[in-house]
From Swiss-Prot:
Keyword RNA-binding tagged: yes
PANTHER family attached to this UniProt entry: 50S RIBOSOMAL PROTEIN L9
MF terms in GO: rRNA binding; structural constituent of ribosome
Family, similarity comment: Belongs to the bacterial ribosomal protein bL9 family.
Protein name from the UniProt record: Large ribosomal subunit protein bL9
Keyword Ribonucleoprotein: yes
Biological process terms in GO annotation: translation
Task of the protein: Binds to the 23S rRNA.
Organism: Rhizorhabdus wittichii (strain DSM 6014 / CCUG 31198 / JCM 15750 / NBRC 105917 / EY 4224 / RW1) (Sphingomonas wittichii)
GO CC annotation terms, alphabetical: ribonucleoprotein complex; ribosome
Ranges annotated as biased composition (Low complexity): 192-202
Region feature Disordered, mapped onto this chain: 168-202
Name of one Pfam family that matches: Ribosomal_L9_C
Amino acid sequence: MDVILLERVEKLGQIGDVVSVKAGFARNYLLPRKKALRANEANKKVFEANRAQIEADNANRRGNAETEAKALDDKSVTLIRQASNTGQLYGSVSARDIVEALAEDGIKVAKSGVVLGRPIKTIGLHEVKISLHAEVSRTVKVNVARSPEEAELQSQGVDVMAQLFERDEAGFTEDYDPNAEPGEIPTELQDEAPAAEATDEA
C-alpha cells in the first residue's frame, strides 16, 4: 500500500514522502496513529494544500519534545528485582516498569515511547531508548539489581556477576605442583610430613 507520511518515520522517510508499506502496517499503525494518509489523488491534494501547516505543527511538537528530553539527559533509574545467583531475573522488566520508574522521578513518558526490543531478564546496566517524537529521543540507563547496595556498585562500574564468579572460583583453588609425581607430597608441605609420620608411629 502507498501512503503519504505526515511525519518522519524511522526507516521509511520524511514528511510528504510517498512510500510503499505492507497493508497491515498501514492499517494497524500508520493510519490510526495519523502518521500517514493513503496515497490517493484526493489525499495528495489535501496534503499539498495543508503542507505548510502540517510541517509547522510537527516543528512545534518537536520543540516541545526537545524541552521534555532535557529531563532525560544522563538519566538513570534503578529497579530492584529478585534474581538467581546467575543474575537471571525471576520475571522481567517491561516498558511499563520503566515508565513507572520515570514517573516516580516526575518524568512522564508514554509506554509506546519506550523502545524495548525485548524484556530485560538479567541484572546489570541496560540502555533503553526513550522516543518523545519521531525526531527526538534519549537513552536512559536502567540499573537492575537485587539490592540497593548492588545497584550502587553497578552504578560505579562494578561487574557484580563477574566478581561473584571470581570469588566462587577462588574458593576452590588448591595448591598444585606441576612437577610432582602421583602420590608425592608437594615441596611446600614436606616440612609438615615428619610431624604427621611421628604422630602415626606414636
